Amino acid sequence: MTDNKMFVEAGKDDALSIIGLRHKIWSTTYRGIYPDHMMDDFDWVWHEEKELSRINDPAYSVYLIQKDGQNIGYLTIHQANVITLQSLYIVSEYQRQGVGRAAVEHVKAFCGECDAASFICYCVPENVNARAFYERMGGTLIGADLTNDEKWQNSVTYQFTLA
């Protein structure tokens, strides 16, 4: 399931689709982890501005994930001193079908094009499903920031080393 057509580089016209996916996925994934108001009072304008800034910033590569012509998720890669899988979100009905694995392979290919030997990603510690996924994909836990006043802002860091 590593079809490159699955990953379509996002343009400014895709920002609303991405934040629509974000709202849907956050509502099913982060309820009970993030404060409810982050889903219930979702600030569409703020998220659109944030997404447009990423899409327009050459340090970011934003992709819609598509299957059968339908947007089923998105991923964002940030390229700075280290390549970071900034976000990987897949709607629940398409999880456990190889889409996430294909996304990790896509990020690895991106790293290969940049001559990078590894990439990292951050995850909310309470998101046990994502953590288990990253570990199954070969991620090694290399750090944690558990000192934030707001528990949902804490993170753990995984590193993926390319073979």
Please provide the spans of the model-predicted regions:
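Acetyl-CoA-dependent GNAT
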Residues: K5, E9-K12, I19-E93, V104-H106, ...
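Conserved GNAT acetyl-CoA-binding A-motif
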Residues: C111-C123
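Conserved beta-strand-loop-alpha-helix junction that forms the acyl-donor binding cleft
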Residues: C121-R131, N148-Q153
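Structural motif
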Residues: L21, C114, R136-M137
